Amino acid sequence: MSSNSHYFDLKDYSFKETPKGVRVFWTAMKYVVLVIACVLVIIPLITVLIGSFKTKTELMNTSAFILPKSMAWVNYARAFTNGRVLEGLGNTIFIVVVSCAGSIITGTMTAFVLQRFNMLFTRLIKAVFLATSLLPTITMQISVYQIVVKLGLVNTYGAPLLLYIGTDIIAVTIFIQFLDNISVSLDESAILDGCSYPRVYWSIILPMLRPAIATVLVMRFVAIYNDFYTPYLYMPNHRVVSTALRDLTTGSNVSWNVVFAGVIICIIPTLIMFLSMQKSIYSNLVSGSVKE
């Protein structure tokens, strides 16, 4: 940067040139924020885990952080039987697996068409996708519910499956952004070698979208697994995880130790999903593409 210049040029400045004391301070602040965030997340989980092993009397008369005198495993058995948690887990896993698979297939296909084919209304369709994602979901529920009723899908698995697969606008947006970084020359080379567009999609595009698929998979899994409104409204006679936990809290004499046990049971699949997918998300987030 010129000595005669009165303006600050970011190109001539780097974090390494800051005083050592300032670097140490900001590094320490980052770790302090991370520790505080971890504590805020972990403390509620610890209290729920401890409470799930207490008796009802012990839970009401002791501190949330005091360990139980004996492990009340019966709370977990009661959560499975009284709250129909096992039924809810089975229904939820079925809905999640089918919905995630459908979202990935329809999302990648839609993104492939919108990003690769310069049709007349491509930009308009993208704008409509973005605009609809900004609308509050609750504002469309009356018309959506009427459509579901006319299709005869109330109290069936078809209603949540149709809604989860057909309204995944965020997944389409993520796939389009990843496709922007994949060279079109790969498609052209494959077509010159005799590949059809479905073969290009299946053999080239889909494998290169693995980082985006992993990200969407985790997002959709958590969103669908935790959703209460859709299954409660469209399939009230079938239990999922969220509605099964609600059943444990109904009535005048709620056993919160059993509720805590149900919460821990329902957390386990989400935890397993994240731990199994985090390596793929973090290590492959910016890989797998050729830029022009």
Predicted regions and their residues:
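A structural signal for multi-pass alpha-helical bundles of membrane permease subunits
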Residues: 4-11, 19-22, 26-292
